């Protein structure tokens, strides 16, 4: 499991983001979702996150810029993700599925992201 923290841009605003390969899905807090179109899934989604079970009935499409690279991915909206070890609130938890989709690899020894596998185009079969 690898974790990297850095800011990404959502609608021109920098958002503190945790890239976590131990999390399957991507999550955003309501202040981030306010800049995005939120939809209501047909059922409540429950997820174990940060030692507790959180519920949501809101989802969004996260459109963001990571180190200048545009990304789009599905995200669940939850009231609170948690804080990092410095006490800074995490606004976005970027999960493993989205990292795989966008070719993002955490490099924990250097505390950075490797975007050398970012797809310039998608090839579908």
Regions found by a protein language model. Name each.
Residues 20-21, 57, 86-87:
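Short glycine/proline-enriched turns and hinge-like loops at secondary-structure junctions
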Residues 34, 65, 100:
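Short polybasic/polar patches that bind polyanions
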Residues 43-58:
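C-terminal reverse transcriptase regions that engage the nucleic-acid substrate
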């Amino acid at each position: 499991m690898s974790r990297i923290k850095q800011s990404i841009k959502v609608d021109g605003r920098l958002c503190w983001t945790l890239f976590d390969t131990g999390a399957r899905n991507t999550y955003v807090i309501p202040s981030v979702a306010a800049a995005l179109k939120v939809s209501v899934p047909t059922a409540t989604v429950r997820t174990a996150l940060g030692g507790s079970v959180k519920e949501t009935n809101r989802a969004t499409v996260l459109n963001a810029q990571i180190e200048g690279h545009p990304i789009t991915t599905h995200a669940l909206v939850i009231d609170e993700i948690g804080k990092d070890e410095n006490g800074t609130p995490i606004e976005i938890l970027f999960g493993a599925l989205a990292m795989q989709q966008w070719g993002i690899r955490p490099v924990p020894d250097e505390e950075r992201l490797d975007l050398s596998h970012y797809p310039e185009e998608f090839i579908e079969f």
